[in-house]
């Protein structure tokens, strides 16, 4: 069985993330969407809230499961029996950082490959940070996040209707 781990903070999940997950699910037998506990970022949503959001959004993908982890991503991937890490790329500017991380991960776990998937062009401008900024100021989130996540963001920021 070909297992891949797609790690990230998913704070919140965006349509760009969803695009990468859906395409990874077509390539791998099982995809583990792994929410990282971060000691360096202050998240908007708790781990539990992010896991719940992901479960709602991904429920129709039978070969995708959601989990949380701490520590080194490659260690977690090994524990899951994964042979690949999925990394989404929005633009060339993402590549330098991701390439450096891929080399580091390869040094730590030579048996685990990093697979880069480009998001569709229509999602290339979306990041969790930009989504939070738009939501914070009551802007339109249409096409940026899945509908259930839009509702959660509107509740979180006390927004009403369309931005």
Curated annotation (Swiss-Prot):
It comes from the Bacteria. InterPro entries: Cyt_trans-like, PPAT, Rossmann-like_a/b/a_fold. It is found in: Cytoplasm. Pathway: Cofactor biosynthesis; coenzyme A biosynthesis; CoA from (R)-pantothenate: step 4/5. GO terms for cellular component: cytoplasm. Gene3D superfamilies: HUPs. Keywords: ATP-binding, Coenzyme A biosynthesis, Cytoplasm, Magnesium, Nucleotide-binding, Nucleotidyltransferase, Transferase. Coiled coil: none annotated. The keyword ATP-binding applies. ATP binds at residues 9-10, 17, 88-90, 98, 123-129. It catalyses: (R)-4'-phosphopantetheine + ATP + H(+) = 3'-dephospho-CoA + diphosphate. Its EC number is 2.7.7.3. The record marks 17 as: Transition state stabilizer. One of its GO terms (molecular function) is ATP binding. One of its GO terms (biological process) is coenzyme A biosynthetic process. Homohexamer. Belongs to the bacterial CoaD family. Reversibly transfers an adenylyl group from ATP to 4'-phosphopantetheine, yielding dephospho-CoA (dPCoA) and pyrophosphate. This is Phosphopantetheine adenylyltransferase. It comes from Desulforudis audaxviator (strain MP104C). The gene is coaD.
């Amino acid at each position: 069985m070909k297992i891949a781990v797609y790690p990230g903070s998913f704070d919140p999940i965006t349509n760009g993330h969803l695009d990468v997950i859906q395409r990874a699910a077509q390539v791998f037998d099982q995809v583990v969407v792994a929410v990282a506990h971060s000691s360096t970022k202050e998240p908007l949503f708790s781990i539990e809230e992010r896991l719940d959001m992901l479960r709602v959004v991904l429920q129709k993908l039978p070969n995708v499961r959601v989990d949380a982890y701490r520590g080194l991503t490659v260690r977690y991937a090994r524990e899951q029996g994964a042979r690949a890490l999925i990394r989404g790329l929005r633009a060339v500017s993402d590549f330098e950082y991701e390439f450096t991380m891929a080399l580091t991960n390869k040094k730590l776990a030579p048996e685990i490959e990093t697979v880069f998937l480009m998001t569709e062009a229509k999602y290339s401008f979306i990041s969790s940070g930009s989504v939070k900024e738009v939501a914070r100021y009551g802007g339109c989130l249409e096409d940026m996040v899945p509908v259930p996540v839009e509702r959660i963001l509107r509740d979180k920021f006390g927004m009403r209707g369309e931005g």
